[in-house]
């Protein structure tokens, strides 16, 4: 079976956590069908902290690190755009997966859309209705460059509808006929995963001998 290659772009630490849920699902259920390439832009990157994040979340370290670091919005976005374009040309993924509303999000959306690679936006449709916020510009622009939009809330669906997105899919998904899906919050998947992990690994009840008699917290 030929694997489809997707390229996931992350930059901020919250994006690592969100991307982990999808990465684990791919590894567990779709490893023969999907190859995931992980790119860290370096927007928020500390070698020690990030290494702990990836280890604790149970996902591999990034295949690429652009090491962009901090700077102005324009400087960071331009550096990411240049680095991502080179990686996309090399890897030629079937799709690029982005999360949220950071500079990494908008840079990846721009890089992919301009060379006609479909963009998959997870956490699409969210709005603060304050365009003075850089994140609001990022999330609006990213949505309008995406082919598949995965929306966590019903309010997000309403926001996209007001911006002209169609909810009835009559054609194959493409950038000028995107498909919108109400999928729920990906952080809930992480909550379920770590709740189960905690139940399996925690020994605090035994260590404190709380299993000897009933107790109340």
Give the role of each language-model region.
Residues 2-6, 25-34, 43, 59-61, ...:
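Non-catalytic terminal and connector segments of soluble metabolic enzymes
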Residues 7-10, 16-27, 53, 65-175:
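Active-site and donor-binding regions of nucleotide-sugar-utilizing enzymes
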Residues 8, 38-40, 121, 182:
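Structural beta-sheet core signal
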Residues 20-21, 49, 53, 58-63, ...:
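Solvent-exposed, flexible loop/coil residues
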Residues 32-76:
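Conserved nucleotide-sugar phosphate-binding/catalytic loop shared by glycosyltransferases and other
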Residues 44-48, 146-217:
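A nucleotide-sugar donor-handling region in carbohydrate enzymes
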């Amino acid at each position: 079976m030929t694997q489809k290659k997707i390229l996931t772009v992350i930059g901020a630490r919250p994006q690592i956590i969100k991307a982990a849920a999808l990465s684990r699902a791919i590894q567990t259920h779709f490893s023969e069908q999907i190859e995931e390439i992980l790119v860290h832009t370096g927007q928020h990157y500390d070698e020690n902290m990030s290494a702990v994040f990836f280890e604790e979340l149970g996902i591999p370290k990034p295949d690429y690190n652009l090491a962009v670091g901090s700077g102005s919005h324009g400087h960071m976005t331009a550096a990411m755009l240049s680095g991502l374009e080179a990686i996309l040309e090399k890897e030629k993924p079937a799709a690029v997966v982005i999360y949220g509303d950071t500079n990494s999000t908008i840079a990846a959306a721009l890089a992919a859309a301009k060379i006609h690679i479909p963009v998959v936006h997870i956490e699409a449709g969210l709005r603060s209705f304050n365009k003075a916020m850089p994140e609001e510009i990022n999330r609006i622009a990213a949505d309008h460059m995406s082919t598949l939009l995965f929306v966590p809330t019903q309010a997000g669906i309403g926001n996209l509808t007001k911006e002209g997105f169609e909810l009835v899919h009559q054609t194959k998904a493409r950038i000028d006929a995107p498909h919108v899906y109400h999928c729920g919050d990906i952080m809930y998947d992480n909550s379920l995963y770590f709740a189960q992990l905690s139940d399996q690994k925690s020994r605090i009840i035994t260590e404190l001998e709380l299993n000897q008699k009933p107790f109340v917290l």
